[in-house]
C-alpha cells in the first residue's frame, strides 16, 4: 500500500499501486488537467509511471519550469514525427531542449525550405488533434539496435552503440512514430499545441566538421497560446533591437570576414562608447581598492598544463605556435597570469586581501556555427578580477564584490537580477570544511545584500562554489553577466602561499570575478537594451550643432568648440542640406540632442535645443547647454529628460 507524501506535507495512501495521473486525479480534477509529469523522490518521471512504494511525489504542471521542459521535449518529438510522416526518407538524430524552445537535427538530402516548415507545422497541429497516447517502453540493447537498424535509422544505432552496456534503454511511441529517449514526455500529443517552428540551420553531426551536415529545425513551445504570443512579440521586438544591424547602421563595429569570423573591429563611434565604459570600470575599481594589471596575450604551453587548461579546456584553445623549439599558446583566460604576479614575492597575512583587475583580451576557439555578432566571438576582453584572501575574509570580500557589481550594473540602468548560488558537485577538490564555510559565506553575503537567489544544488565548479547573476533588459530578456567564483584548485596547482600570523605557510583563497563578462558581449546587450539610443553619458555623439544654412556655419563651429572644451562629444553638420533633412539624419543616428542655430540664435548667443524624440526644449544660452550636458554626462544620467 503506497504512502505518497505531497509537497505540502500531506499524505495520500492507496490500497494498490497507482500511476501519477491517478494520483493527480485523486488530488483534484484541475490539477490532473494541468499535469504533464511528476517528480518522484526528486526524479522527473512520466505520469504513466507506476507508484508502487512509499515516495515523495510532486505533480508537475504545464506552467512550471519542469513542465515547460517536458512540453518542449515532447514538441521536439512531435516535430520529428511530422517530418518523417511528410518526408519518410529523413533520418532522425537528436532533439534536445534549449532556452525557450527546442531543435531537432535531421539527415535529409536537401535543405528544408520555408514552405517545408509551414507544411511540417501544419502536420504537427494535425497530430495534436489526433491526441495520440505517448507510451514508454524498455528494451534491451540488442533489441533496440535491431529495431532501429530495421527502421534504417543509422544515427540512432550509432547513439545506442555509444551507450555503456548495462544502462537501461527506453523508447517512446506515439502513433506509428518511435524514438529513443530517456523521457519523460507528456501523456498524449493533445497536451501540446502552443508551438511555432522558427528557422532552419545546418549542423554537423556531433558538432564535428568531418561528419555529415544535418538539417536543424528550431522551434519554440509554451504552456499556453498567450505565452507563445507574448514570446513571439518579444522576438519581433528583439529583431528591431538586433545589435548586429544597429551596430552597422551606427558604424559602431564590424566583423571583417577577410580577417576571420568572431573577431571584432571597433569603429570610431563604437570605440568612443567602449572608452567611456572602460574608463568608468577602471574608476569604480580603483575606488573599490583594486589595482589594475596588464598581462601578455600568450604564454608557454607548459603554463596551461600547470593551470589544467590543457587537460580540461584544450578544445577551446587555439593550437600552439612554435618559436625556437618552445610552444606558446594564446591565453583563453587571465587567471594564471595574475597568479604568476602574486608568486613574484612572498606575501604576509597582513597583505591580504589583494584585489587585482584587468581588462584582458582572451581567445577562444569557438566553432564558426556558434559565432553571433558581439555575443559569441573568438577574441574578447574580459573584465577580469581576482581577489586573494584568507578564509576568514571570504564573506566580507564577496559582500564588497556584490556592492561593486550592483553599483556598476545599476549605473548602466540594470537593476533587476536573477541570481543563482551553485553549490558543491559530486566530484570536487577541497575539504568539506572549506566547502561548507565558503558556501555559507556566499549565502551570508547575498542575504546581507538583501538579494533574492536560488540554489543550484551541485551546480558549482569542481574547484569551488559560485554566484551567477543575470540582468534583465528593456524587453524582459535575461542575460548571463556577472560571476563570482571561489577557487580552491588553482592556488594548490600553482603552490601559492602566504605567511600566516603563526608563521606557517598557508594557501590563499582565490576569487575569480567578472561583472560584464566581456566588454564585447556587454556592449551588444547595451545596444539591444537601449535600441542604440544610448543615454547622453554613453552616446558616441552627445550633441550635434545644425546651422540652418551655410551663413551660420562659423557660429555653429564656435558653439561646438565651446562644448568640446567642456568635454562634450559634440559635432557640427555643415552640409549644404535643408535643416529638416539634417534633423532627420541625426535623429536616425540616435544623437541625444540636436542644437539648431540661425540668425536669431547667432544674435543672442543661444541655440535651439531639441532631443532625438522630437521634443522642443527651448532656446538656451551656449553656457547653459554646455553646463547641463556636462552635468548629465558626469552624473551618468540614463534618461533624455533635460537636467537644466
Swiss-Prot record:
One of its GO terms (molecular function) is ATP binding. Belongs to the class-II aminoacyl-tRNA synthetase family. Zn(2+) binds at residues 335, 386, 512. Keywords: Aminoacyl-tRNA synthetase, ATP-binding, Cytoplasm, Ligase, Metal-binding, Nucleotide-binding, Protein biosynthesis, RNA-binding, tRNA-binding, Zinc. InterPro entries: aa-tRNA-synt_IIb, aa-tRNA-synth_II, aa-tRNA-synth_II/BPL/LPL, Anticodon-bd, Anticodon-bd_dom_sf, Beta-grasp_dom_sf, TGS, TGS-like. Its EC number is 6.1.1.3. Its main location: cytoplasm. This is Threonine--tRNA ligase. PANTHER family: THREONINE--TRNA LIGASE, CHLOROPLASTIC_MITOCHONDRIAL 2, THREONINE-TRNA LIGASE. It comes from Acidithiobacillus ferrooxidans (strain ATCC 23270 / DSM 14882 / CIP 104768 / NCIMB 8455) (Ferrobacillus ferrooxidans (strain ATCC 23270)).
Amino acid at each position: 500500500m503506497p504512502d505518497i507524501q505531497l509537497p505540502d506535507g500531506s499524505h495520500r495512501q492507496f490500497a494498490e499501486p497507482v500511476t501519477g495521473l491517478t494520483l493527480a486525479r485523486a488530488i483534484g480534477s484541475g490539477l490532473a488537467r494541468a499535469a504533464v509529469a511528476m517528480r518522484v523522490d526528486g526524479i522527473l518521471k512520466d505520469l504513466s509511471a507506476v507508484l508502487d512504494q512509499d515516495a515523495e511525489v510532486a505533480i508537475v504542471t504545464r506552467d512550471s519550469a519542469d513542465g515547460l521542459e517536458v512540453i518542449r521535449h515532447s514538441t521536439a518529438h512531435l516535430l520529428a514525427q511530422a517530418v518523417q510522416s511528410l518526408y519518410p526518407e529523413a533520418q532522425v538524430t537528436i532533439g534536445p531542449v534549449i532556452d525557450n524552445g527546442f531543435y531537432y537535427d535531421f539527415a535529409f538530402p536537401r535543405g528544408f525550405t520555408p514552405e517545408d516548415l509551414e507544411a511540417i507545422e501544419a502536420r504537427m497541429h494535425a497530430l495534436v488533434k489526433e491526441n495520440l497516447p505517448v507510451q514508454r517502453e524498455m528494451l534491451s540493447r540488442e533489441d533496440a539496435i535491431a529495431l532501429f537498424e530495421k527502421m534504417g535509422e543509422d544515427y540512432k544505432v550509432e547513439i545506442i552503440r555509444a551507450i555503456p552496456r548495462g544502462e537501461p534503454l527506453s523508447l517512446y511511441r506515439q502513433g506509428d512514430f518511435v524514438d529513443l529517449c530517456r523521457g519523460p514526455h507528456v501523456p498524449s500529443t493533445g497536451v501540446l499545441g502552443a508551438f511555432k517552428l522558427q528557422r532552419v540551420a545546418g549542423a554537423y553531426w556531433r558538432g564535428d566538421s568531418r561528419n555529415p551536415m544535418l538539417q536543424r529545425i528550431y522551434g519554440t513551445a509554451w504552456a499556453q497560446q498567450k505565452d507563445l504570443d507574448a514570446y513571439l512579440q518579444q522576438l519581433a521586438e528583439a529583431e528591431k533591437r538586433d545589435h548586429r544591424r544597429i551596430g552597422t547602421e551606427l558604424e559602431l563595429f564590424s566583423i571583417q570576414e577577410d580577417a576571420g569570423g568572431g573577431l571584432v573591429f571597433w569603429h570610431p563611434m563604437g570605440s568612443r562608447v567602449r572608452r567611456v565604459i572602460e574608463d568608468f570600470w577602471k574608476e569604480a575599481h580603483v575606488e573599490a581598492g583594486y589595482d589594475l594589471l596588464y598581462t601578455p596575450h600568450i604564454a608557454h604551453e607548459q603554463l596551461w598544463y600547470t593551470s589544467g587548461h590543457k587537460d580540461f579546456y584544450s578544445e577551446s584553445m587555439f593550437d600552439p605556435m612554435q618559436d625556437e623549439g618552445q610552444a606558446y599558446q594564446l591565453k583563453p583566460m587571465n587567471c594564471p597570469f595574475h597568479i604568476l604576479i602574486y608568486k613574484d614575492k612572498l606575501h604576509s597575512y597582513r597583505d591580504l586581501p589583494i584585489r587585482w583587475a584587468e581588462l584582458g583580451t582572451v581567445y577562444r576557439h569557438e566553432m564558426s556555427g556558434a559565432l553571433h555578432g558581439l555575443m559569441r566571438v573568438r577574441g574578447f576582453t574580459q573584465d577580469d578580477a581576482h581577489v586573494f584572501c584568507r578564509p576568514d575574509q571570504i564573506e566580507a570580500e564577496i559582500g564588497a564584490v556584490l556592492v561593486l557589481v550592483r553599483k556598476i550594473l545599476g549605473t548602466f540602468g540594470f537593476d533587476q537580477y536573477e541570481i543563482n548560488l551553485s553549490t558543491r558537485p559530486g566530484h570536487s577538490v577541497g575539504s568539506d570544511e572549506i566547502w561548507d564555510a565558503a558556501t555559507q559565506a556566499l549565502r551570508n553575503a547575498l542575504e546581507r545584500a538583501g538579494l533574492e537567489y536560488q540554489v543550484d544544488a551541485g551546480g558549482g565548479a569542481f574547484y569551488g562554489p559560485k554566484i551567477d547573476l543575470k540582468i534583465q533588459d528593456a524587453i524582459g530578456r535575461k542575460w548571463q553577466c556577472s560571476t563570482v567564483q571561489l577557487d580552491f584548485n588553482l592556488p594548490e596547482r600553482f603552490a601559492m602561499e602566504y605567511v600566516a600570523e603563526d608563521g606557517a605557510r598557508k594557501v590563499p583563497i582565490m576569487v575569480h570575478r567578472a561583472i560584464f563578462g566581456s566588454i564585447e558581449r556587454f556592449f551588444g546587450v547595451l545596444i539591444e537594451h537601449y535600441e542604440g539610443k544610448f543615454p547622453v553619458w554613453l552616446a558616441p555623439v552627445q550633441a550635434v550643432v545644425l546651422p540652418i544654412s551655410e551663413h551660420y556655419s562659423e557660429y555653429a563651429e564656435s558653439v561646438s568648440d565651446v562644448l568640446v572644451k567642456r568635454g562634450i562629444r559634440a559635432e557640427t553638420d555643415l552640409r549644404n542640406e535643408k535643416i529638416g533633412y539634417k534633423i532627420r539624419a541625426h535623429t536616425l543616428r540616435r544623437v541625444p540632442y540636436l542644437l539648431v542655430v540661425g540668425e536669431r540664435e547667432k544674435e543672442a548667443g543661444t541655440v535651439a535645443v531639441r532631443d532625438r524624440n522630437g521634443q522642443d526644449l527651448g532656446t538656451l544660452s551656449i553656457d547653459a547647454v554646455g553646463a547641463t550636458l556636462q552635468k548629465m554626462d558626469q552624473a551618468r544620467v540614463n534618461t533624455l529628460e533635460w537636467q537644466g
